[in-house]
């Protein structure tokens, strides 16, 4: 089977020392039923399919050209699966919407404005190199697909992104190269009859690292002359790409179709309206205030409608009313433009370079972190700044380029700003575009993450609109950020420039306007927005209704904008000349660092530790992969407290004997309470010490005095060689814990004879000494604890089985090499209910003797193979024969046993005749 005929052309972009890039246009393989379909490739690893399709019939009720541009970002293009719940692409991202605007703005003026057939351009991103941006590729692909679609299109138009890197303008720069860009500019244009390139669209801004590159490394500053040079540098690249599109049109274009055009009005109707309303409109268009002017114009229009009610009866009412409105609007346009071109006279009486009245205020909204109101004439912008932790920075699921940003600028323009009603809710494309432009203007002067570790959200509320709300947003944002305490490197201001062109006395002239009104924007040829500091430009945007504007006209407009920018900066500096003190309601963020290997300890299992710190202190904590810790709280006190805790975990201080702590009870047991001294460090406050909190009286349970969560003042009594900490109540630190007498006191307690001689304690073989001779005052009268409740795991050296109620840090101590007892022999001495069952075993395994198997305590000799006086080795369990601590363990074990002791008569003497 014979395949489709594929036709392709190439444009080679030579960047000198930065290498070459190849842009290839291919048609014939994909989307064969679209009017025009082109696959555009950049270096064969980024691919975008562009299709252009027109509706078969016109939309007669439309009074505008219905062009739609859509960008479809396919996540598979970057090897990703969409992160949404349904795992498929949904609404377009902000990046896709901005790409749509870049494509729409240069294409729209090249269609007949009286065309009423729907035209849709769809850009599908099929593959993208993660080091490349796709927006400019899509712009060129859109022009190419429209060129071969057979539509009435006065193309081609081409676009190029240039980056000023190390003093050279580089076309189609990679993301990695753009890190060192001082300035970036996207320029779209078309080749005109004289071979020059007319500029149709500009989107530009200083690089995010521009300040560092300019003032620390001495790179070129992007002032007006440098930016004008960038416009000239773009022309050769635009021409090369336009030539490739012309070549593609020659070999693949369809024949241009005939489309019905719908004139907006008839010449006769326009002449009649001019005759009726010219004088009145001339006067109305001299009213400076917007709303009174609009009211007067509406009255004139109604008068014209009444006069023409009986005229032009060959039109139906709807058609007549639509053409009347179009002709009336065109008459206003001609009056405004003629006065500017011939008299340098503007609607509100200003000169061409004059700026409207300016005012600026800060701190007008209570409790917010920063606020400001900037007003230029009737354009009024409220700026509000919010600061938060860096973890609140926006995550971007982009195909390429940055995946997050810490400065987020949102622009909103409600319908009441123009005195109208309308939809309120999610942002429209225009609002997203204006927010992105204001963001681009301010990013170069923001402090670095290290200098100011905050995520910043800036909202610009256009609460009054009469021209250039986007540049008003830049000014209001500068004021608001400074009021919030953000240490901007320099204040930024913005101004909107306009253009009116036409023939006067047989000569085509251009008049550039400073600070345009809404009506001048609507009736003019250009909206040229310029933002920057006093020394260089930070953002540019150009929209035009013309096929293109000469570069020298734009260069002159840049110089005119610089004058206006300086005037606005003076007003800003008078209002606030530097960053203010941060609001008391703004979070205070401090930083610390922990070793990477300690990050897990700070976070804890399943975030237990970090969540506990946040709960206890009220601070917010974020930890980055390199160990940098950001801690935030209102006022800063909680943040300092959290920092101290984190530092203690990362560089722990081991409590020492004699140190006093206000600790929190984290667990209670039958033998005492565990008290948290520092994060991750607990100590045991024995029940004998807890009695001191009850005036020394006997207590039945620890919970009668201390409960979990209580705070208690304790003193460190001692730290053993394994780091286990015993605590005491201050003033009673010399008191011995009954459950754990020190090793050195055994002689006093046992008559000084050690394990080999018990006569003093028992009064001879098998006999206990008198109770009054014992150190434990009332031991025999105390209720006995079951061994299962004996939780003194921290203070003996005996290995033991894992039990479900063991504390986590108890388990960590089981790293000794002592052999473990068999589980079958590891029984509680009080488990006597199943004694008979155990005795019925018929195996020959040796068993331990149980206390119930002996008639008297003196039967120990049978169990241990002889008298205790036979020597230290003869009474040792062979399983622990090699353990040097075995004797100590047995001594402790006997003193803590839970077995009921048999009462022995004091007057009984077994040796009596």
UniProtKB/Swiss-Prot annotation:
UniProt GO BP: mRNA catabolic process; RNA processing
Cofactor(s) required for function per UniProt? Mg(2+)
The compartments listed are: Cytoplasm
Q: Which reaction does it catalyse?
A: RNA(n+1) + phosphate = RNA(n) + a ribonucleoside 5'-diphosphate
Q: Which SUPFAM superfamilies match?
A: Eukaryotic type KH-domain (KH-domain type I), Nucleic acid-binding proteins, Polynucleotide phosphorylase/guanosine pentaphosphate synthase (PNPase/GPSI), domain 3, Ribonuclease PH domain 2-like, Ribosomal protein S5 domain 2-like
What are the EC numbers? Answer: 2.7.7.8
Residues in domain KH?
587-646
S1 motif domain segment(s): 658-730
Q: What is its main location?
A: cytoplasm
Region ranges (Disordered) = 407-427, 727-913
Question: Which Gene Ontology molecular-function terms are recorded?
Answer: 3'-5'-RNA exonuclease activity; magnesium ion binding; polyribonucleotide nucleotidyltransferase activity; RNA binding
Keyword Flavoprotein in record: no
Task: Give binding positions for Mg(2+).
Answer: 521, 527
Read off the SMART domains from this record.
KH, S1
Q: Which family does it belong to?
A: Belongs to the polyribonucleotide nucleotidyltransferase family.
Q: What is this protein called?
A: Polyribonucleotide nucleotidyltransferase
